Amino acid sequence: MKNRFLVGSAVFASSVALVGCGMLPGGDDKVITIWLMKDSVSAAYLDRFTEAYEKENPSVELEVQIQEWTGIGKKVMAALESDDSPDIIEVGNTQVAQYAESNGLRDLTLESVRDLGSEDWLPGLAEPGSINGSQFGIPWYAANRVVIYNKDLFAEAGIEELPKTRAEWLDITAQLDQGDQQGIYLAGQDWYTLSGFIWDENGELAVESGGEWEGRLDTPEAIRGMKFYKELQALGDGPKDSDEVKPEQEGEFAKGDIAQIIDTPNSAVQIEEKNPDLKGKLGFFPVPGKSAEAPGAVFTGGSDLIVPKNSSHRSAAVEVVKALAGEKWQTDLAKTMSYVPNKTTLADVIEGQEATAAMAVGAAEGRATPNSPKWANVELDNPIKPYMTAVLQGEDPKTAAAAADARISAALR
């Protein structure tokens, strides 16, 4: 196996000098430089993929360079503007729009439709990668929130059937919210969870109108989503004025007196580390929807793969992307990392994995943040959070929503 795993820009610079314009000493061989994010995939997975790909494509060498999330936005933008960019970059699914705005990405629409079966992609990965009808980001993997529950507390309450609708969910959560026990721990500013409730009501966080983006919390649909959030949040003691990391909800759940939290399945590892008595006692189910026919909408996080326009080996890079996004290596990735694969048609590859299967059901209804290149400006000083707190503390929802919309609109312009 020829690949090298490198970390950091200093090593990147020296490796480029060694391979010289991406060519190997043989003359026609190509070095495909891939930037992957730290901890996205295991070394074992990369070893398997690289060995198999290089065996099938002997003129190609894969050079994987591991990147830190901190500061990655500026680093990618600099790479897109340089003459020495990597050939493939893993990016967060909600970051594609800002990179596409630089006009530095290769349009992969043809490959998406012709070779990759884009009609089956998860919407929460595919939609953020599509800008004005052109596909720049190729979905790679997804992760989203589910309900993590304490099986012992459910059993003690006599709950045998997991909820499939919002109404059922509220009913059992009220049953579980007794005495010193909390039915659910839901922090007041968990805006990712609120987003799903708003989407369930056919609302939006923001929309583009006349070429400009505007906040859309002050609509009947979005306000209904906030109303449901308030009902659910009241069935526990989560703080109204902070988010899910202050304090960390995994630590709160690990105390053993909380029946449910809304979190990504991999949080179960943290919970069990904090309280080993909970090993084997955690269950998972999709966030319930308004009806039993479909789960609730959820915010989908994950990664897309992009190919810079200034890649030295664009065609060869696209072939590597097609392999990574194809069924064989998507199946391997899902089983190795417990991720949701990039297509709804691959959901059966994770059967038997309770947590990942629950996540995959929800991912079919997944969405991402508004596809504005300036959405990151909203999250810097997120006005959705104080809006939520205001409503939970009794302020008129329309008044609070209008104030938040003004700030969202300003951040997007």
Task: Please annotate each region the language model reported.
Residues Y339-P341, A358-R407:
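C-terminal capping/gating helix-and-loop segments adjacent to ligand/active sites or protein-protein/ligand interfaces
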Residues T109-W121, I184, E204-R224, E273-D277, ...:
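Short, solvent-exposed loop/beta-turn-alpha elements that line the ligand-binding surface or hinge
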Residues N93-N144, F197, G283-F285, I350-A355:
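Hinge/lid segment of periplasmic solute-binding proteins
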Residues M1-T33, K55, A406-R413:
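Short, low-complexity disordered leader/linker segments with a strong preference
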Residues P86-D87, D115-L153, Q182-G183, A294-A297, ...:
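A structural signal for short loop-to-beta-strand junctions that line the ligand-binding cleft
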Residues T173-D177, E212-S242:
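Glycine-centered hinge/linker elements that transmit conformational signals in sensory
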Residues M37, V96, K227-H313:
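Extracytoplasmic/periplasmic substrate-binding proteins
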Residues A52-W121, P128, A155-A157, K164, ...:
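Extracytoplasmic "Venus flytrap"/periplasmic binding protein-like
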